[in-house]
Amino acid sequence: MVRISVLNDCLNSIVNAERQGKRQVLVRPSSKVIVKFLEVMMKKRYIGEFEIVDDHRSGKIVIDLIGRINKCGVISPRFDVTLDEIEKWASYLLPSRQFGHIVLTTSLGIMDHNEAKTRHTGGKLLGFFY
């Protein structure tokens, strides 16, 4: 089977493990984008700690789940958004105004939409979680 998007595979594994009530999930392969996306999720307390296991191949990530994720996904294609369009995308993708986060990649790094608004920058949409 050919992997189209490793980030999409990772987020699907997390959602499936959450629905089954698992406490941990093993995700492979590892990538910098996945690690940064998980750091945003951990900062917002949607997942617990995660550990990167180097197996001298593509790497693995062991993620501790805390039962807060209802849905997460990748936005493909990665649309360009300006600062003004972030709120439109948030209302389109998230269930309510103060629930959930959109993750974007900007020139300042990977961050959620609230941090992008405070830093006054736009970027490309990566995904969302709530």
UniProtKB/Swiss-Prot annotation:
Gene3D superfamilies: 3.30.1370.30, 3.30.1490.10. GO terms for cellular component: cytosolic small ribosomal subunit; extracellular matrix. This is Small ribosomal subunit protein uS8. Belongs to the universal ribosomal protein uS8 family. One of its GO terms (biological process) is translation. Coiled coil: none annotated. GO terms for molecular function: structural constituent of ribosome. The gene is rps15a. It holds the Pfam family Ribosomal_S8. Keywords: Ribonucleoprotein, Ribosomal protein. The keyword DNA-binding does not apply. It comes from the Eukaryota. InterPro entries: Ribosomal_uS8, Ribosomal_uS8_CS, Ribosomal_uS8_sf.
